[in-house]
Amino acid sequence: MPGPAVDAEKVPFRSAKEEIRAGVGVEGSEGGGGGGGRERPGARGHRQDIVWRNVFLMSLLHLAAVYSLVLIPKAQPLTLLWAYFCFLLTALGVTAGAHRLWSHRSYKAKLPLRIFLAAANSMAFQNDIFEWSRDHRVHHKYSETDADPHNARRGFFFSHIGWLFVRKHRDVIEKGRKLDVTDLLADPVVRFQRKYYKITVVLMCFVVPTLVPWYIWGESLWNSYFLASILRYTISLNVTWLVNSVAHMYGNRPYDKHISPRQNPLVTLGAIGEGFHNYHHTFPFDYSASEFGLNFNPTTWFIDFMCWLGLATDRKRATKQMIEARKARTGDGSA
């Protein structure tokens, strides 16, 4: 069973706007009492240089993924199943690992599980755990401001992929430096992955997915590389990005109508349980990232299974009373 809910007033990484409504002044937030200036949506006052290397590499990756589609009929069924299995591992490295464990500390994981999730996270190749988690904490605390790495108020393209095509806004860097990330640096698994990130990415994201089909059931290296590595990697990237873009623009807001994140079932389907985004931004400490627990939430299934095995503990959960009170106070009435 899920662990007891934590006190909402003690939950870390609340958004700046949420702290405003709770009467807590936040430097640089909208209307905050900390004396900071108003955070403006967008980056009109700050030029962000285009990172042409990223533009080129991402364009090349997506072109290669399109080419990969023509190889699907030529590949062995086991290769396609392997590619999907690698996609699930990749997703768990982000959702159960970098997101719910390391960014939000919504549950605790023992060393074997942390090692597994770190390996899966390297397969995801979306920055190392430390950087991913730090930026995600900034995203929650300063959502929809210039300090948000993928500020949805700058449009669909920017929040989906465009934010990777430019250098980080100075506010993202500044706010990130002010966050307390000592818990991340205290984890030897996080430190190891960060130190050897390039090596682990090459092995987990490209070498292992490619060699397994070739070595075990005789798939061609060409098919293995493009399907289990390139296509799988490209799809997993876009699924994660959909949470930043689609789930911040399309859907209802039953828990807090004053924030951008929405409930989006299609994103939930692709991102194995991460599409209950209005709930997640309202109750970021909840390990399930959803009011509905096991209602198509594979990441929650995985964490619960790890708890059953004794590899995870201390799952945090919002109480029913807390959820209903929040719906009545700030929800849009859709649920």
From Swiss-Prot:
This is Stearoyl-CoA desaturase 5. Keywords: Endoplasmic reticulum, Fatty acid biosynthesis, Fatty acid metabolism, Iron, Lipid biosynthesis, Lipid metabolism, Membrane, Metal-binding, Oxidoreductase, Transmembrane, Transmembrane helix. Expected to bind 2 Fe(2+) ions per subunit. GO terms for molecular function: iron ion binding; oxidoreductase activity; stearoyl-CoA 9-desaturase activity. A motif (Histidine box-2) lies at residues 136-140. Residues 24-44 are annotated as: Disordered. This protein has no ortholog in rodents. The gene is SCD5.
